[in-house]
Amino acid sequence: MFYSLMRESKIVIEYDGRGYHFDALSNYDASTSFQEFKTLRRTIHNRTNYADSIINAQDPSSISLAINFSTTLIESNFFDWMGFTREGNSLFLPRNTPNIEPIMFNMYIINHNNSCIYFENCYVSTVDFSLDKSIPILNVGIESGKFSEVSTFRDGYTITQGEVLPYSAPAVYTNSSPLPALISASMSFQQQCSWREDRNIFDINKIYTNKRAYVNEMNASATLAFYYVKRLVGDKFLNLDPETRTPLIIKNKYVSITFPLARISKRLNFSDLYQVEYDVIPTADSDPVEINFFGERK
């Protein structure tokens, strides 16, 4: 019998002494690599074809997780780890970045034969999800400074995912008025960081790993796709003109995203049915973008 390693894998995140077990995975991807220093020691008398090469560092690892939303709402922790401010089940993207360094955690990818890869010094770089005609999936991008293969791992998990949430139809509102003919709504939240280059003399003859990073900026955006319709002649919103300082609420039965003041640019796609896409970002004077999860957080 053959086993798919990906199908049998588990993801466990260690943070603040607790273990978060994500088993409602739709997909994941991870890769590791090393940096090489190589030079040819050529002189006018000797032209060797064999390079002098050493492995001197680990490249930062990129990990992407596609996670189903579940009844325990532990998926919302990725927004905490990204640096959002939490008040109950509400999360706010701060106007000014509160942290110089991103929140760090460690992560295991555990296979069915108990072999696992341990990623250290991890931070969340992106969190994306879409509300459309399918079950919502959270796409999480993670950067890690160090990886290693280990034979032991956390066997007990403090928090695990619950049942996968069923489909719920999305809707978009502006000034309490629904916008018709919605096709899909995609949200993207990013934390852009850079690794600190802190090598010293004690790292000579060692494989260097990244340990610390610093936050450059955080941002939020959304893309809304509609069929191009007009409710009334001279409609002031359902047109192709850009909008600014417009409040928007994107929601379904389980989650809502609020842009208190948004700038909207519109793109018309010509096909059998005209479609218009709204590119949404918060304005500079907007209150914090808010994400609300409806339900009991475990």
Swiss-Prot record:
Q: In its keyword annotation, does this UniProt entry include ATP-binding?
A: no
Q: Kindly list the GO CC terms recorded for this protein.
A: virus tail
Keywords, alphabetical: Late protein, Viral tail protein, Virion
Q: According to the UniProt record, which cysteines are disulfide-bonded?
A: none
Where primarily located? virion
Enumerate the subcellular locations listed in this protein's record, separating them with semicolons.
Virion
Q: Which Pfam families match?
A: Baseplate_Tube_p140
What is known about what this protein does?
Answer: Forms the simplified baseplate, together with the p132 collar protein ring and the cone (DTP-pb9 and BHP-pb3).
Subunit description: Homotrimer. Forms a pseudo-hexameric ring. Interacts with collar protein p132, DTP-pb9 and tail tube protein pb6.
**Stated name of the protein:** Baseplate tube protein p140
Q: Which organism is it from?
A: Escherichia phage T5
Q: Taxonomic lineage per UniProt?
A: Viruses, Duplodnaviria, Heunggongvirae, Uroviricota, Caudoviricetes
